[in-house]
Amino acid sequence: MAAKGGTVKAASGFNAAEDAQTLRKAMKGLGTDEDAIISVLAYRSTAQRQEIRTAYKSTIGRDLLDDLKSELSGNFEQVILGMMTPTVLYDVQELRRAMKGAGTDEGCLIEILASRTPEEIRRINQTYQLQYGRSLEDDIRSDTSFMFQRVLVSLSAGGRDEGNYLDDALVRQDAQDLYEAGEKKWGTDEVKFLTVLCSRNRNHLLHVFDEYKRISQKDIEQSIKSETSGSFEDALLAIVKCMRNKSAYFAERLYKSMKGLGTDDNTLIRVMVSRAEIDMMDIRANFKRLYGKSLYSFIKGDTSGDYRKVLLILCGGDD
């Protein structure tokens, strides 16, 4: 069985004040010692990085984030700043970035809201309100529309049942309702899909997907693809994928961020930073299984310089 869990672990023999001095030295005077910055920050846990930031302020009298911002640039800066941000706040900042200014990064909104646990969603809501003085839901409403808006608002409520409880009658009813809302009739009753996919617990949904296949002879994903479209379709598919296998969902997000011409660096950075301590080993295993190549080799071929160095450390090894 492949190793599970994260690739970034808390460093043993950790000394925040020493790390703070190393970082200051790396940025003081002319030029920047990027390797020294990487050697400290890429090998510490998120919690340890917060301690380093505090030690930096108390022993040097400067803000580490401000110094990093002025010394670094481009994708390397973005990945380092992401690593320096507490987990929930990082999600909150990404959600805000996805909606700020012209255009919307729908993929980012879907990825975060479909993959985080109800508890994480609740913390995201609180932090968003504190950070920006308005609710996440209000921003979603002003930035999106129609069924896509409704599915995001529903996910952002964090109201999914977290139990394991299975009611066979309800499983059959949900599967039948989904069938009747889509495949069985002309036109689609989108609200039914939303209700079932956004509120039921994972165990229940996995049984609903099996029952749905039995009744309709189709995977629920196939039906979603043929019955819905656009960002609403993307959101429903993300929910189903996260329920079936969350690590495989992230492997696909990473694959799509790098395949073909150009790189979607925002997605690549966000997934690598936010999953490094949670399930990067599982993501790697799924990546290899789905695409026949290692995540490591993909990152190596698609990025360069210090940016590549950090991502490869977060990846944690070749498969």
From Swiss-Prot:
It is a peripheral membrane protein. Its main location: membrane. Keywords: Acetylation, Annexin, Calcium, Calcium/phospholipid-binding, Cytoplasmic vesicle, Membrane, Phosphoprotein, Repeat. The keyword Acetylation applies. InterPro entries: Annexin (IPR001464), Annexin_repeat (IPR018502), Annexin_repeat_CS (IPR018252), Annexin_sf (IPR037104), ANX4 (IPR002391). The modification N6-acetyllysine is found at K213, K293, K300. The modification Phosphoserine is found at S12. One of its GO terms (molecular function) is calcium ion binding. It comes from the Eukaryota. Annexin repeats lie at residues 14-85, 86-157, 169-241, 245-316. It is found in: Zymogen granule membrane. The modification Phosphothreonine is found at T7. GO terms for cellular component: cytoplasm; nucleus; plasma membrane; vesicle membrane; zymogen granule membrane. Gene3D superfamilies: Annexin (1.10.220.10). Pfam families: Annexin. Transmembrane segments: none annotated. The modification N-acetylalanine is found at A2. Calcium/phospholipid-binding protein which promotes membrane fusion and is involved in exocytosis. Monomer. Belongs to the annexin family. Seems to bind one calcium ion with high affinity. A pair of annexin repeats may form one binding site for calcium and phospholipid. This is Annexin A4. It comes from Sus scrofa. The gene is ANXA4.
